[in-house]
């Protein structure tokens, strides 16, 4: 068969015109090494800091170190199936997690995937986990309270909506108990809660979830769990994922409360990731940016003004402020609050609740040291009735602690000193509270009123808590109108004060105290 040149050229042209040359441009690289969840990848010349990378087997990673000819990335999840020579692709996306009310009542991992066996979560929206905190102009001052239901906190270390209040103490001092009680007390108050568990035993997390379910608190709570068995990368990112879920409510004019339990373990996880990425270590082998690790997280907790909410929702929500209140937890070693991470977080937050082992072992629970626990902005948010009644309590306690130290050495004490010591003992006893039994505002007001006006002075110390319970029951059965007025107005008028005095006197006469 003879082909002339013109036929050959026509054949070639027709083949070229029919050729599908649509190429997909992908930035790819090759795995050089994989150790302890850290992958070194050659190539990926166009990768961004913090970009999600796609590994074989539908596994994702995060680009953290951008070097001249390689990229250091952490793998999110299992990494055993990744081997040298595997192809890695850029996704062009930043790490996102699902957000919205569909998450309420669920337990999820750092990536927002359900781990409670209750089926998939059909969240309609996702959001990035790393965000810039609201600016100064978008914020509003803290002026509404977050009632924890714990007498010693609501009276002496009040927390406001949009505040960051640190809970700090050694292991086994009741830090998680305080945080869980605060979540349980938000029932019916329109506050959505997020509990972030970092580096804890899976059994401990399951126990907290069970308690929240028992008290009906899971209806308005999301639990983000990064257990001790999860990779360091998942533990380090969990608080940011939880914060994004909380911000969903804040930015839409709702109130949210987030507990980070605890940030010490997050700092340990970040230190591990940084050292494996061969970043230079600093004090206590932490990387240089460990302060920024916590500051950029905690600055996202804020009270935002109505303009911000209106702009964010494109006018759908008008005239409502939103807030995200943070309760970060820090575990100290042998009471050393001057270590690197505790001092960092103390300087970032708006106050701290300091829990002491000695008080805990002495049976004073919650074991709050009233002397060094402070709330720098919560005073403006405290309910009027509690604010007016709690001033005397703090003074009584401070004087009692001071005198108790001297009283150990002095054999004979004058009447005034003895009186102060007796009152201090009773106030200390009054501030004890069993776990999972948060109090309402009227109950706290009644207890503080009884202490301030000397009604407890002739009650035996061992009878203080039974006296308090009896008083609350007495008020509930016979003085319902008074209770409702205190709950509604959050104030104690002259008439109500006289009625409350009469009620307490009436109870003391009828009861055998």
From Swiss-Prot:
CDD domains: ATP-synt_F1_alpha_C, ATP-synt_F1_alpha_N, F1-ATPase_alpha_CD
Pfam family for this entry, one: ATP-synt_ab
UniProt keyword annotation of Nuclease present: no
Gene Ontology annotations for the cellular component aspect, listed alphabetically: plasma membrane; proton-transporting ATP synthase complex
EC assignment: 7.1.2.2
PROSITE patterns the UniProt entry points to: ATPASE_ALPHA_BETA
Site (Required for activity): 373
Molecular function GO terms recorded: ADP binding; ATP binding; proton-transporting ATP synthase activity, rotational mechanism
SUPFAM superfamilies listed in its UniProt record: C-terminal domain of alpha and beta subunits of F1 ATP synthase (SSF47917), N-terminal domain of alpha and beta subunits of F1 ATP synthase (SSF50615), P-loop containing nucleoside triphosphate hydrolases (SSF52540)
Origin species: Cupriavidus necator (strain ATCC 17699 / DSM 428 / KCTC 22496 / NCIMB 10442 / H16 / Stanier 337) (Ralstonia eutropha)
Protein localization: Cell inner membrane
Reported function: Produces ATP from ADP in the presence of a proton gradient across the membrane. The alpha chain is a regulatory subunit.
Subunit-level organization: F-type ATPases have 2 components, CF(1) - the catalytic core - and CF(0) - the membrane proton channel. CF(1) has five subunits: alpha(3), beta(3), gamma(1), delta(1), epsilon(1). CF(0) has three main subunits: a(1), b(2) and c(9-12). The alpha and beta chains form an alternating ring which encloses part of the gamma chain. CF(1) is attached to CF(0) by a central stalk formed by the gamma and epsilon chains, while a peripheral stalk is formed by the delta and b chains.
Keyword set includes Translocase: yes
Keyword line: ATP synthesis, ATP-binding, Cell inner membrane, Cell membrane, CF(1), Hydrogen ion transport, Ion transport, Membrane, Nucleotide-binding, Translocase, Transport
Family note: Belongs to the ATPase alpha/beta chains family.
UniProt name for this protein: ATP synthase subunit alpha
PANTHER family, per the entry: ATP SYNTHASE SUBUNIT ALPHA, MITOCHONDRIAL (PTHR48082:SF2)
Annotated positions binding ATP: 169-176
Reaction catalyzed: ATP + H2O + 4 H(+)(in) = ADP + phosphate + 5 H(+)(out)
Lipid bilayer topology: Peripheral membrane protein
